[in-house]
Amino acid sequence: MDTSDKWIIQRTGISSRYVSETENTSDLAYQASLQAIEDANIQREDIDVIIVATMTPDCMTPSTACLVQAKLGLNDCPIFAFDINGACSGFLYAFQIASDLLSRYEHILVIGSETISKMIDWNDRSTCVLFGDGAGAMILGRGATQLYHYANSEGDTQQVLQADGLSLVQDLQNNEPSTHYLNMKGNDVFRFAVKVLKESIEHVLAQSNLTMDDIDLVIPHQANYRIISHVAKKMKVDLSKFYMNLQEFGNTSAASIPIAYAMAQREGKIPANGRVILVGFGAGLTYGATLIDNRGGQ
C-alpha cells in the first residue's frame, strides 16, 4: 500500500491505534463497563438498562448488550438490554435514548464498543489508516444535570459511507458475495462532517440559550484532525476548546466519544460544574449533539 507514517499523521493527525487480536466487541464493552461502574460508585446489580452502540457486534444475534449482561453476571437481574447501530453517531444516539429512559429506570449503562478492524480492507488507504478498536462506557442516573439533545439522519443514497451486508435483492440479482468491508468517499464525508458538526453544535446551543463562550469543552467524534479543525475555524472558536485524542486511538467509531470523555475527565479538563458538548456524525448518514450542563441549567 502506498503510504507512510508521515503521510498518515499529516493527513489525519493519527499516530497510533489499537487493534484487537482475540477480543470481541463484547469483551471490550465488558472491560469498559467495569470501569464505568467503578467510577459511578455503584454495584453491578444497580444497573437497570444496558445499551450498546456498535456496528461490529459479536454476532447477528444475540445482541452485544445481552452478552455484556451475561459477562457482568447479571442474568438473574431484571435488565433491559439492547443494541443500536448509529455507526459513529451510535453512542450519541444511545445516550439520548438513555436520558429519555431515566423517567422509568434509575441506572443506565451506555456503551460504545467497536472492533472495526474486522471490517477494514487493509489494502484500502482511504479507510485502513483511520480506524482502531476500543470501547468506552458511562452510567446515566437521575440528578440535577440538564441535558439538551439534537439528532438527525439522512438516508445515504449515494453510498458515501457504507459496509455491505446481507441483502435479498443482491442475492436475487446474483451479485458477487459481499466483502463486508467499510467503504468511504473521503471528500464527500469531509464536507458532510464539517457541515453537520457545526449545525449540531448550533442546535444545542440555541436550545440551551448558551453560546460557545459558556462551554468548557467540546468532545467531538474523533474522526480526523482536519475535520475537527475546520469546524473550529468555521465557528470562529479556538481549537483548544475541542478535545482530541485521535492521535493515540484513531477513529474508534461509536467508542470514540465515551473514550474521549473519560480521558478528558481524568486529565481534569471537565470541571465539576462544567458544560460539555458531545457531537458526532457517522454512516447512515447520522449526526447529532448533546449538551451536558452540570450547573443544572442555572
What are these regions (language model features)?
Residues 1-7, 60-74, 110-116, 168-175, ...:
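Acidic-glycine-rich active-site phosphate/pyrophosphate-binding loop
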Residues 14-15, 46-51, 72-85, 117-123, ...:
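Glycine/charged-rich beta-loop-alpha catalytic/anionic-binding loops adjacent to active sites
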Residues 177-246:
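A contiguous, well-structured pocket-lining segment that forms one wall/lid of small-molecule binding clefts
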Residues 1-22, 124-191, 195, 199, ...:
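Condensing-enzyme catalytic core mediating Claisen C-C bond formation in acyl metabolism
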Residues 2, 32-48, 199-216, 264-269:
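Phosphate/pyrophosphate-binding loops at sites that engage ATP/ADP/AMP, CoA/4′-phosphopantetheine
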Residues 26, 30-33, 37, 56-57, ...:
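Claisen-condensing/thiolase-fold acyl-transfer catalytic domains that form or cleave C-C bonds
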Residues 105-135:
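Flexible, glycine-rich active-site loops centered on histidine and acidic residues
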Residues 48-51, 109, 216, 277:
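Conserved beta-strand elements of the Class I
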